[in-house]
Amino acid sequence: MSTQANGSTPEPIEKVSIIVSKGSLEGVYPGLIMANGARMEGIEANLFFTFFGLDAISKAKHENVKVATVGNPGLHLATWAGGIPGVSSLVTHKLAQEMEKLDIPPIPEFVEMIAESGAGLYACKASVDLFGLEREDFVDEVQDVITVGEFYGLAAGGQIIFT
C-alpha cells in the first residue's frame, strides 16, 4: 500500500457512488467498468444514471448505445466526418469487436452482471420526469428512481465519481 505525502497510509475506499450522465458508448462504459472493478475488490458501489446516461438502463435504448462521433476529440476525426451517416454505427461496431476480444460485455449484459454483484443501480428522478419516463421504461436491474438528495444519502461516507 502506498503512503501519502505526510507519511500516513491512506484509508481504504469502502464505497463509491458513480454518476453516469452521458448516453454515448464512451460515456457509459467508464462508470460500468469502475462499478464492476469496485465490486470485484469488495467495495460497495452504486450507479446513479442521470440525463442521457439513462440510455444505458432504458429498455428502449440500452442495446443501441453508440459512440458519439461528432465533435469527439478522442476519435481524432474531423467533426464533419463524424456526421456522415453510418460513421457512428461503424465506429461503434469496431469498438464493440475490440471490447469483445477483451471480454468486456455489451451494456445490457454488463448492467445485469453489475447488479448481480450487489451494486445498486438508480435512475435520477429529475431526469426521469424531464424526459417523461416511468419506472417501467427501465431494465429490471434498476432498483429505484431516486432524487438527488436520496442519492447523496446513499453516497454518504463514500466517494462520489462523476463520469
Where do the model's predicted regions map?
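N-terminal glycine-/serine-/threonine-rich phosphate-binding loop
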Residues: 1-27, 33-36
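Polar low-complexity intrinsically disordered regions
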Residues: 11-15, 72, 157-158
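Short, glycine-rich nucleotide/cofactor-binding loops
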Residues: 18-28, 57, 98-102
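Histidine-anchored nucleotide/phosphate-binding helix
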Residues: 29-42, 47
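Short internal beta-strands
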Residues: 45-51, 122-125
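N-terminal beta-loop-helix "entrance" segment that forms/cooperates
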Residues: 53-66
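A glycine-rich helix N-cap at a beta->alpha junction
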Residues: 65-106
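A charged, amphipathic interaction segment
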Residues: 90-145, 149, 153-156
